[in-house]
């Protein structure tokens, strides 16, 4: 019997297994940030251990950084302590750090692929749940806890049980205006926010193959919102073209050798998955969440469902609670829901193609009165590229704030956060209660949908937008 891509990656990284025990896997890349690493480095120090493979360990500052200045004091005492601690730990243990003043600083799941640290066939871990992003390259990538961060720092290995496998097939091609964010929200809406629990999900099908690497990263980024351990997409020519020439990618003769191997990284024709789910791309409309988990999502032209229509009592109770928190009523159309804030950014949607999509909507328009809208590029290189293309001017002329790289309003760990009762159209990945600030109400959308909400002052169907007239 053939193997799935996940099974190939898992088996290739087993360094030790004993009957009845969890296999030990080798970890190729370890990504580190300021929030989940301090105790791990303290553990090394207490045991007088070193970092086993510092050349395969990379650190950045992203969660706590200010997006308005590079002042390490800007986001408060805890943020300052965590960032200064990361700097000291990286100096002591010989780990490469992309600090506040490094031109490549940015969100960890943006800079890894951007710098070519993320490679097909590799295992990648980080003390962050959205490490699944890197699976877009055919890498086995998943988030780990702080004790596991310490273990990988010390040994470059990790014990991991085998996961079940799920194949998600997106047949056909998406209509104009439908993005990877819409695809993955539709998948989560179909399966539920726990529908992937215990699985590694492989995305495939014509609609997935048609996506750019940036779109594929969005898909895999939100696999965790299905409850999945990781997301995967088999590498192909699109993958290789993206990686070629990046700083940490193979060079010269090693490049062709690597590509030859990477071409083998796909599920065999006779591989069996534990579950297969198929969606039709042409059935997917622009998506917007209405509740407090990513599975509570609908098409923009669909009214909010009544909890009474849900057969599962747990889902029904969750919907009642979500509607109360979000201050919404069943039957309401999202296009009738006004917003206060717009956030375009996060490890889900802060790459150059995301900013281009939002700028295409913002060009020649203005942010609606009473709406605060911000655009936060995912890294220094993304910011520089956007400015070279004039996207920053499009945004600022439309009334958006153009910020510095960081995790920003994805989570309430820095100065960018919602006030109680504020409603936000957000390109991030989680709409949990209080995720963007205590009492804040988060609606997940694509970059184009977020920009449309900003200029309309309410949610709008991006398919109805036309390019403004130009002289």
Curated annotation (Swiss-Prot):
One of its GO terms (molecular function) is 3-isopropylmalate dehydratase activity. Its cofactor is [4Fe-4S] cluster. GO terms for biological process: L-leucine biosynthetic process. Its EC number is 4.2.1.33. CDD domains: IPMI. Signal peptide: none annotated. Pathway: Amino-acid biosynthesis; L-leucine biosynthesis; L-leucine from 3-methyl-2-oxobutanoate: step 2/4. It comes from the Bacteria. It catalyses: (2R,3S)-3-isopropylmalate = (2S)-2-isopropylmalate. Heterodimer of LeuC and LeuD. PANTHER family: 3-ISOPROPYLMALATE DEHYDRATASE, HOMOACONITASE, MITOCHONDRIAL-RELATED. Belongs to the aconitase/IPM isomerase family. LeuC type 1 subfamily. Catalyzes the isomerization between 2-isopropylmalate and 3-isopropylmalate, via the formation of 2-isopropylmaleate. This is 3-isopropylmalate dehydratase large subunit. It comes from Edwardsiella ictaluri (strain 93-146). The gene is leuC.
């Amino acid at each position: 019997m053939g193997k799935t891509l996940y099974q190939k990656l898992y088996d290739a990284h087993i360094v030790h297994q004993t009957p009845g025990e969890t296999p030990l896997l080798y970890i190729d890349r370890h990504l580190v940030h300021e929030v989940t690493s301090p105790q791990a480095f303290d553990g090394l120090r207490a045991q007088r251990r070193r970092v086993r493979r510092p050349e395969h360990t990379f650190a950045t500052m992203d969660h706590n950084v200010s997006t308005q200045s590079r002042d390490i004091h800007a986001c408060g005492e805890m943020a300052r302590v965590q960032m200064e601690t990361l700097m000291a730990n990286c100096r002591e243990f010989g780990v490469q750090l992309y600090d506040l003043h490094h031109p490549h600083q940015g969100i960890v799941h943006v800079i890894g692929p951007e710098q070519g640290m993320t490679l097909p066939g590799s295992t990648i871990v980080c003390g962050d749940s959205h490490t699944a992003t890197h699976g877009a390259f055919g890498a086995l990538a998943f988030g780990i806890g702080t004790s596991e961060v310490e273990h990988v720092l010390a040994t470059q290995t990790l014990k991991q049980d085998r996961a079940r496998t799920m194949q998600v097939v997106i047949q056909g091609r998406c209509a104009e205006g439908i993005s990877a964010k819409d695809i993955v929200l539709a998948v989560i809406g179909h399966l539920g926010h726990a529908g992937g629990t215990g699985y590694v999900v492989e995305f495939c099908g014509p609609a997935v193959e048609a996506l750019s690497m940036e779109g594929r990263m969005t898909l895999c980024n939100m696999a965790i919102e299905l409850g999945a351990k990781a997301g995967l997409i088999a590498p192909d020519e699109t993958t290789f073209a993206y990686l070629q020439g990046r700083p940490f990618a193979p060079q010269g003769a090693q490049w062709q050798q690597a590509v030859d191997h990477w071409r083998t990284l796909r599920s065999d024709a006779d591989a069996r998955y534990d579950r297969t789910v198929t969606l039709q791309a042409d059935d997917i409309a622009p998506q917007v969440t209405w509740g407090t988990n990513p599975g509570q999502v609908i098409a923009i032209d669909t009214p909010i469902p009544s909890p009474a229509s849900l057969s599962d009592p747990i889902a029904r109770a969750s919907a009642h609670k979500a509607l109360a928190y979000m201050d919404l009523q069943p039957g309401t159309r999202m296009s009738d829901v006004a917003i206060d804030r717009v956030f375009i950014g996060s490890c889900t949607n802060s790459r150059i193609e995301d900013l281009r999509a939002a700028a295409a909507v913002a060009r020649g328009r203005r942010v609606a009165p009473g709406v605060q809208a911000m655009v936060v590029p995912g890294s220094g290189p993304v910011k520089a590229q956007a400015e070279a293309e004039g996207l920053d001017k499009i945004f600022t002329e439309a009334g958006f704030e153009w910020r510095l790289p960081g995790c920003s309003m994805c989570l309430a760990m820095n100065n960018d956060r919602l006030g109680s009762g504020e409603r936000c159209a957000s390109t991030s990945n989680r709409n949990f209660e209080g995720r963007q600030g205590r009492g804040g109400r988060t609606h997940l959308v694509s970059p184009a949908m977020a920009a449309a909400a900003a200029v309309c002052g309410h949610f709008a169907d991006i398919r109805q937008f036309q390019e403004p007239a130009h002289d």
